[in-house]
């Protein structure tokens, strides 16, 4: 099972597309959405949201492979993503605009991996849509179903 852990107050922009992939993946992917912390102090927002992500992972997903989406990290093809997640429970972390304290996450979770969908900046809901679509492609690889590799 894969979990998409994101900080969000709305996914309304692409909710029908996200729901379509969620139906296709059925129980293979679940969403765990944390409410964003709102404050004018961006450093405080980063601190509070990092704490929230850490607590959630420790409580629910400690045994899962932890993967942080970050625009400046390693680019993967769909096949490489499949090889990274093949037959494992994974929690994918999508952060809110100000980011998370990556050093704190890395020190807390030594098994944290980082992947990227490119150097562009995209809204969290679009990253979520791209991720769930890629997870669907990975699922088709797993079951040997053709889906425009």
Q: For each predicted feature, which ranges?
A:
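Structural signal for conserved beta-strand scaffold positions within catalytic alpha/beta enzyme cores
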Residues: 5, 33, 68, 116-117
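Catalytic-core regions built around general acid/base machinery
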Residues: 21, 83-86, 108
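Conserved RecA-like P-loop NTPase ATPase core
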Residues: 67, 95, 131
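S-adenosyl-L-methionine/SAH cofactor-binding core of RNA-modifying enzymes
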Residues: 26-91, 99
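Structured adenosyl-cofactor binding patch, chiefly the S-adenosyl-L-methionine
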Residues: 104-149
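Ser/Thr/Gly-rich flexible loops in soluble cytosolic domains mediating phosphotransfer, phosphorylation
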Residues: 88-104, 124-126
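N-terminal beta1-alpha1 ligand-phosphate binding loop
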Residues: 1-26
